[in-house]
Amino acid sequence: MSQIDKAARRQKIKARSRATVHGNATRPRLCVYRSLSQIYAQLIDDESGKTLMAVSTMSKDNAGLQGSKSERSAAVGKQLAEKAIAQGISNVVFDRNGFRYHGRIKALADGAREAGLIF
């Protein structure tokens, strides 16, 4: 499968899942983006169109993260969950953004669940 086909497939899956996955202030959407070397996670309130918080491997808090990409993804998930719980958010809707639930995406989700987020 060529890179163009993979990108088009991911965009199609993303559009299909976004039709059913919505977040609000009490249960925001946990949106994940994975690049080749980094991972980004945001909590989004779709009703007001605002990003409540964002954490990534590029954040200043994560400047010294060591380990594999999966281990860093799990650390980002834990950090996001801790920030969310501090703001009173415990339930979220997980949006994998067209990526397969495998590898770094799964590691981030598991890290967030370990730290107390419910989804």
From Swiss-Prot:
Gene Ontology biological process: translation
GO terms of molecular function: 5S rRNA binding; structural constituent of ribosome
SUPFAM superfamilies, sorted: Translational machinery components (SSF53137)
Region Disordered, residue ranges: 1-20
Classification via Pfam families: Ribosomal_L18p
Keyword Cell inner membrane included in the entry's annotation: no
Top-level division of the source organism's lineage: Bacteria
Keywords tagged on the record: Ribonucleoprotein, Ribosomal protein, RNA-binding, rRNA-binding
Gene3D superfamilies (UniProt xref): 3.30.420.100
An annotated GO cellular component: cytosolic large ribosomal subunit
Role summary: This is one of the proteins that bind and probably mediate the attachment of the 5S RNA into the large ribosomal subunit, where it forms part of the central protuberance.
Binding partners and assembly: Part of the 50S ribosomal subunit; part of the 5S rRNA/L5/L18/L25 subcomplex. Contacts the 5S and 23S rRNAs.
The protein's name: Large ribosomal subunit protein uL18
